Regions:
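Intrinsically disordered, low-complexity, mixed-charge
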Residues: 1-119
Length: 119
C-alpha cells in the first residue's frame, strides 16, 4: 500500500467516524425539496464528497455528489428543506474544507431518487 493510499484510508476513516458520532439535532417535519448545489473552493481531495454522502445518509436525504472537472463539487440533495440546509451549514463549518462559493438551484422533486450515492 502506498503512502498516499494509506493517507486516504486514514482520512476516510476519520470522516466516517466523525459523521457517525455527530449528534444530530431534532428536525421538525418540513417541505420536501430538491436542490442542485455547486461548491467551489478547497472541496476536492479533502474527503468532501464522502462527508456529504455519509451525512446525507444519516439525514435520510437522497441524491448524489460528484467532482466536476473544474475542481468544484456538485451535489443534488433531496429531502426535508431543514435537513438540506443543516447539511450545507455543517459542510461550511468544517476547517479542512474551504467553501469559497456555493450556487444553489431548486429543482423539481424526483420521486425516483431513493438513495444517496457518491459518484
Amino acid at each position: 500500500m502506498s503512502l498516499k493510499s494509506k493517507f486516504v484510508e486514514i482520512r476516510d476513516n476519520y470522516v466516517i467516524n466523525q459523521v457517525k458520532n455527530l449528534k444530530l439535532p431534532e428536525f421538525k417535519s418540513d417541505t420536501i425539496r430538491r436542490y442542485e448545489v455547486i461548491f467551489s473552493g478547497r472541496v476536492q481531495k479533502v474527503g468532501f464528497r464522502l462527508e456529504v454522502c455519509e451525512l446525507a445518509k444519516r439525514l435520510e436525504l437522497t441524491g448524489f455528489c460528484k467532482n466536476l472537472e473544474n475542481g468544484d463539487v456538485m451535489a443534488q440533495l433531496q429531502g426535508p428543506d431543514n435537513k438540506i440546509k443543516y447539511l450545507i451549514s455543517f459542510m461550511e463549518s468544517l476547517k479542512r474544507i474551504k467553501i469559497e462559493n456555493k450556487v444553489m438551484k431548486e429543482l423539481a422533486v424526483d420521486s425516483e431518487m431513493t438513495e444517496f450515492v457518491k459518484r
